[in-house]
Each structure stands twice: as C-alpha cells, then as structure tokens.
Amino acid sequence: FFMKYKPYLMKDVMDTSAQNKFNVISLFAGGGGSSTGYRLAGGNVLCVNEFVEAARDTYRENYPYTKILSSDIKELTGQDFLDATALEAGELDILDGSPPCSAFSVAGKLSHSTAGKHSDGWGQTKNYSDGKMVENIEDLFFEFLRVAKEIQPKVIIGENVAGLTVGEAKQYFNKIQNTFEEIGYDVSAKVLDSRYFGVCQTRTRVFFI
C-alpha cells in the first residue's frame, strides 16, 4: 500500500473541510498537523486543546477560527469540550490525540540518561519554552483516555512514538490498550511509516484506533 505525496494549498484544506463529512476534537493539537489531515479528508475540526504557547500561536495562525482550550489537559474534563462545541456525549465522530512522547522516544530517553532505558525518562518534569512544566509526561495518554471516556466519541485515534512498543515501554503500550477496553472501546494498534501515507518523509509512529 502506498499513497503518493500530493502538494496542497490552504485553500484546498478549507474547501475540503467545508464538506463537513465528520466532526473532530483534537487534543495535544500542536501547530495543527493532524487537524490539517482531517480537514483535507473533509472533516470539520470543532475544537482543540494545546497547552504550549508557541504551538498554540502557530495553530491560531493556521486556523484562526477554531476554538482552542489552552489549559493543561489534567485540568480539563470531557464536559469542557462538549460545552465548547455544543455537543452531547456520544455525538462526536472522532477524538484525536497525540500526547507528548519524549518519555518513550529514543531521543527522549537518551536525553535523560546514557544507560538507554525507557524508565530513565519516566517520572520526570518536562519544561516547555514558555516556562510551563508538566510532571510525569508518560501519563498524558491516560489523561487523553479519561477525557475520551467522558466525551464518548464514535472513534478515538491516538498516536505516539514507535518506541512505545518495545522494551520497558511495552508495559505502557499494553496498559493503553487495556484502558481503551476498560472505557468501552475495541482497539487496534499498529506501527505505521508516514512515507507510505502521502507524507514526504520517513516517520514511524504507533497508532491506536
């Protein structure tokens, strides 16, 4: 399976998004990468959450009319997102999330220790460029699923580094899948390489759907 890279303009993004085929809420939205993909597929991104100021500013430049909740995900509830989008629980089509992943990445673990163990990066505090700090960054995927349980979307799509599937980190990989099931969802997880899906670079990530 191979999708050819296809250049696009922001006009293309907005035109396809106007088709409003499905609606999306995106957590850990960054500068809007996944939001762009959903819009190119005809989706309407109703609201996003982004904690980091620089990423949030980039998102606003790309999509100035999308609602952004800027609080730490640990301080937000599913109801906050439902209120922001005028949806009821169970009405959202897709909840998307890409929790910060440095605790499970090769680069992340090496930055914490030369021993090369995933666990050396766990329980650490991550410092962001705007001065904000987040403790126990490895637990953010479970905050994502906590919000999902409250929103009850039809589909949940979560993404993280492929390092989550190997070594000590695999205990988190298994726990994530178990948590999907505990909140009432069937889950499939697979490592995919972006170069086969229309992206002009090699980047492997594990996706939970």
Q: What is each of the regions a protein language model found here?
A:
Residues 1-209:
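Conserved active-site and SAM-binding loop architecture
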